[in-house]
Amino acid sequence: VYLDSAGSSQKPTQVIESLKRVYETEYSNVHRGLHYMSEQTSARYEEARSKVAKFLNAEFDQEIIFTKGTTESINLVASSFGRKNLGPNDEILITWAEHHSNIIPWQLLREQIGCEIKVVPVDDDGAISIEAFEKLISKKTKIVAFCHVSNVLGTVLPVKEVAKIAHRNGAV
C-alpha cells in the first residue's frame, strides 16, 4: 500500500502549523545525531511509523517504509518486489490515468525481464470500466499499479473493486 498526498494536494491548516513549528523550533535529521533535538525528531518519526503500522494492521512497524514521494516509492517496488517476483510471462496492469511515475518504472522492468504491461482504458471522463479491467486481468497478472485519485485527470478510481479483483486473481 502506498499513500501519497504530498505532491499536489492542499494541506490542512493543522498540518501547515505543525510543519511550521517543527521547522522553526524542533527540526533535526532523523537517526543522524545523538543530541536532544535529533533524538526527539527520531522518536517522533518512529512514533509516526508505529501509528501507520497500526492503522494498516501491519504485523511489524518495520514493514512501513517512508520515502520522499511517489516516484521513489514506485521505483523501489519495481526494482525490488517486481524484479524478484516477476518473470518473462508475467503481466503488470496499469491504467491510462497514470502519471509517468507509475509508467516508466514498469517499462524499465519490462525491458529488464521481459514481462508484459497491459493498460486499462479510461472513458471520456477519465474513469475506468470494471468490465474492461476484468477482461485484461489474468492469472499471469502479478502487479496491478494504479492511482486512487488521478492528479493527471482528476478522477477517482474504484480502488476497493479493483483491489478485490486483483487479489482474487493472485495479483498485488
Predicted segment positions?
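Pyridoxal 5′-phosphate
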Residues: 1-172
